[in-house]
Amino acid sequence: LSAAPALAGDAAKGEKLFKRCAACHSLEAGVNKVGPSLADSVGRECGTVEGYKYGSGYQAACEKGFVADEAFLTDYLRDPSAKLSEIAGSKQRSKMAFKLKKDEDIADIIEFLKTQ
């Protein structure tokens, strides 16, 4: 089930939290690391980061089609593999092993990403 963030996010807190994400993600368009660039990521259609090789789990979910809106990102940041499995309709694994446990942290990171 999708759930929109229950809390209003704080972009400044999200920026601090993003430092953990920066180990695998860039905020610069066209600069991919282990994970895709997160520039303009909120509202982006799945699988559209140029030059990034998505994992098979993400590709399987993309075949069903989705947009990385706030509801998707909330669920994905909580449990990436579970969200991809839900969309694909079969067990999938995300390349992103990191999970956020606190709803407040999720809302803060999404709010920060909306500014990028």
Where do the protein language model's features map onto the residues?
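The canonical Cys-X-X-Cys-His
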Residues: 19-28, 109
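Short cysteine/histidine-rich zinc-coordinating motifs and their immediately flanking basic loops
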Residues: 33-39
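Electrostatic cytochrome c docking/interface patches
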Residues: 2-18, 29
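Short microdomains enriched in Cys/His and/or Lys/Arg
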Residues: 43-53
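Thiol-/selenol-based redox modules, centered on thioredoxin-like
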Residues: 105-114
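Axial heme c-ligation environment in periplasmic c-type cytochrome domains
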Residues: 36, 51-72, 77-105
